[in-house]
Amino acid sequence: MYYKGRMTQQDTLKPNPSVAIGALTVSNSAPLMVFAGPCQMESRAHALEMAGALKEIAGRLGLGLVYKSSFDKANRTSLGGKRGIGLDDAIPVFAEIRETLGLPIVTDVHEPEQCARVAEVADVLQIPAFLCRQTDLLVAAAKTGRVVKVKKGQFLAPWDMKNVVAKVVGSGNANVLLTERGASFGYNTLVVDMRGLPQMAETGAPVIFDATHAVQQPGGLGGSSGGDRRFVPVLARAAVAVGVAGLFIETHQDPDHAPSDGPNMLPLRDFEALMRELMAFDALAKARSAG
């Protein structure tokens, strides 16, 4: 083990190493998959357009896809930051995407009371990084029976995620995914320690790499967060070479005019070529591991 200390009860609570999301298998040894979509749900029309475009790309590549969009960006830098269309308006849109396009859905939950409602239309409940230690939220998400995807807090060591896994598994749900999105490195800056990927994998859970929030500059623009999307492909290649179950990539047709996280979102026009390259990296990395 990479983490130190005596064996405790949480060390005996094991997550599923292979998690099913519909027909998709998410595992550290399975082919690379992706959670992808715009940062926030801007409108029904935009969500359907993005989901349709991503489905076409995934179909051409033979890539497992879970559609991502947030109904509420509850941790915006400033009070005036746009937060999304809200839960009431988002639920029928998520349901429509699932039913008409056949795509599984992942979205964030911020409060325990949201979990049951969101679970009606989402296949995966995502716990934001800032909330990853909130026990009531983790337990409520786990008890829905949906897959629980937890982002590692920017303030946590990779091995500390064993305690997060134990909260979810100990609540009766072994289907948990862990996500690396970088660690705070001074002010307004994140850095990714790639050692954290295999360290989190030691929990037994599939590990996802968030390639777009990893290049975020939190609060870097004063009233909003900055970022540098040039480094999304760089970090994604590194993570896939190390070995991950999947990627998390926020993408948008016009990220420079997106209501949130524009500086670190990948332009949709670049998504297909990048994923084709990363799938080739993944095949090499996992063939080497299997050998």
Where does each model-flagged region fall?
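Catalytic alpha/beta core domains of metabolic enzymes, predominantly
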Residues: 144-251
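Catalytic beta/alpha-barrel core
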Residues: 85-86, 100-114, 123-136, 147-158, ...
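N-terminal amphipathic alpha-helix/helix-capping segment at the start of soluble metabolic enzymes
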Residues: 5-34, 283-290
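Glycine-rich anion/phosphate-binding loops
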Residues: 40-54, 85-92, 226-234
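Short, well-ordered coil/turn segments that N-cap beta-strands
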Residues: 29-32, 61-65, 99-105, 121-123, ...
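Glycine-rich, proline-tolerant flexible connector loops at the mouths of alpha/beta enzymes
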Residues: 38-47, 65-87, 251-262
